UniProtKB/Swiss-Prot annotation:
<dbReference type="Pfam" id="PF01715">
    <property type="entry name" value="IPPT"/>
</dbReference>
<dbReference type="InterPro" id="IPR027417">
    <property type="entry name" value="P-loop_NTPase"/>
</dbReference>
<keyword id="KW-0808">Transferase</keyword>
<dbReference type="InterPro" id="IPR018022">
    <property type="entry name" value="IPT"/>
</dbReference>
<feature type="site" description="Interaction with substrate tRNA">
    <location>
        <position position="130"/>
    </location>
</feature>
<dbReference type="GO" id="GO:0005524">
    <property type="term" value="F:ATP binding"/>
</dbReference>
<dbReference type="GO" id="GO:0052381">
    <property type="term" value="F:tRNA dimethylallyltransferase activity"/>
</dbReference>
<comment type="subunit">
    <text>Monomer.</text>
</comment>
<dbReference type="InterPro" id="IPR039657">
    <property type="entry name" value="Dimethylallyltransferase"/>
</dbReference>
<protein>
    <recommendedName>
        <fullName>tRNA dimethylallyltransferase</fullName>
        <ecNumber>2.5.1.75</ecNumber>
    </recommendedName>
</protein>
<dbReference type="GO" id="GO:0006400">
    <property type="term" value="P:tRNA modification"/>
</dbReference>
<feature type="binding site">
    <location>
        <begin position="17"/>
        <end position="24"/>
    </location>
    <ligand>
        <name>ATP</name>
    </ligand>
</feature>
<comment type="function">
    <text>Catalyzes the transfer of a dimethylallyl group onto the adenine at position 37 in tRNAs that read codons beginning with uridine, leading to the formation of N6-(dimethylallyl)adenosine (i(6)A).</text>
</comment>
<feature type="region of interest" description="Interaction with substrate tRNA">
    <location>
        <begin position="166"/>
        <end position="170"/>
    </location>
</feature>
<comment type="similarity">
    <text>Belongs to the IPP transferase family.</text>
</comment>
<keyword id="KW-0547">Nucleotide-binding</keyword>
<feature type="site" description="Interaction with substrate tRNA">
    <location>
        <position position="108"/>
    </location>
</feature>
Length: 332
């Protein structure tokens, strides 16, 4: 079998869009229609400590159809792009082997791009280098660590903002643990794109609709136990630079629990921060193709609100996906 023919028989569906656009609900509708396995492509939904604040699928949804890579990491770890790619490829291949259709669902563009465009294969720096990077960020701050990095690896440092603690720490641990910087590894080692037939549905609701939905959802999260979720995180004494500690709502609710903000102030700040993030997500997805033009559908509304409109959107998305899968199997 040729590579092109093999790819036609290996469909991967992609459901992407900004936070709170209704991706999970659409993924469930599609999974019912295509006997699908939903594979998480959200960098915060990988953390088991953050079911509420990351709006992970409900236990009922997880029982109805297979969900993979949700809640699989403790908050003490980092779900890097390379880690996710390796796990996602394994889950996609397992779905194919079981006769199911894999459905990537999420809003983390760099995760999705690791499959569509490939990824630099950087060696594991090791636990000592990771611990050193976290210690330096916590003790000195990201700007000071950025200065250290610039002295030994100026090329990698030049590509990073000094305040980006996560990426600065990652660059330091790579240099410290491998003896080469990020820029070096990006030039020398690459994992190829996944050989498959991609069909993508991107949700792109109006920003005012999204802002209103974010506010409603965050209020529901607070009522549903988000404060207890953050309280449990704080009890672990985790470094603030860890990704889980920077998830939407965590810093703001943590400030409230410390007495630095009222609950209304924390809620307002969290909603604003999430809204700013969704703008960046929408911009990113508008400039990065997840599938070919004929295999891509953009839906300009949120999957929520009016029930009849939502059902029409579900039907349109499922019809498009089934048609493109069928076309892909007939033609190269």
């Amino acid at each position: 079998m040729t590579q092109a023919a093999d790819a036609r028989d290996r469909p991967v569906l992609v459901i992407a869009g900004p936070t709170c656009s209704g991706k999970s609900a659409l993924a469930m509708a599609v999974a019912r229609a295509v006997d699908g396995t939903i594979v998480n492509a959200d960098s915060m939904q990988v953390y088991r400590d953050l079911r509420i604040l990351t709006a992970r699928p409900t236990p009922a949804d997880e029982a109805e159809c297979p969900h993979r890579l949700y809640g699989v990491l403790p908050a003490t770890e980092t779900g890097s792009v390379a880690w996710w790619r390796g796990r996602a490829v394994a889950e996609i291949e397992a779905a194919w082997a079981a006769g199911r259709t894999p459905i990537l669902c999420g809003g983390t563009g760099m995760y999705l791009r690791a499959l569509t465009d490939g990824l630099t294969d950087i060696p594991d720096p090791g636990p000592e280098a990771r611990a050193e990077a976290r210690r330096l960020v916590d003790a000195e701050g990201p700007a000071a660590l950025h200065d250290r990095l610039a002295a030994v690896d100026p090329e990698s440092a030049a590509a990073l903002h000094p305040a980006d603690s996560q990426r600065v720490a990652r660059a330091w641990e790579v240099w410290s643990g491998t003896g080469h910087g990020m820029a070096h590894w990006r030039r020398t080692a690459t994992l190829p794109p996944l050989a498959c037939r991609r069909v993508a549905v991107r949700l792109d609701p109006p920003r005012d609709t999204l802002r209103a939905a974010i506010a409603v959802r965050f209020a529901a999260m607070v009522q549903g136990g988000a404060l207890d979720e953050v309280r449990a995180l704080l009890a672990q004494g985790l470094p603030p630079a860890l990704p889980a500690m920077r998830a939407h709502g965590v810093p703001e609710l943590a400030a409230h629990l410390r007495g630095d903000l009222t609950l209304d102030e924390a809620t307002h700040r969290a909603v604003l921060a999430t809204g700013r993030y969704t703008r960046r997500q929408s911009t990113w997805f508008a400039h990065h193709d997840l599938a070919g033009p004929a295999d891509s559908l953009v839906i300009g509304t949120r999957m929520g609100g009016d029930a009849q409109q939502m059902e029409r959107n579900y039907a349109d998305a499922v019809s498009f996906i089934l048609m493109r899968i069928d076309v892909g199997r007939q033609f190269p």
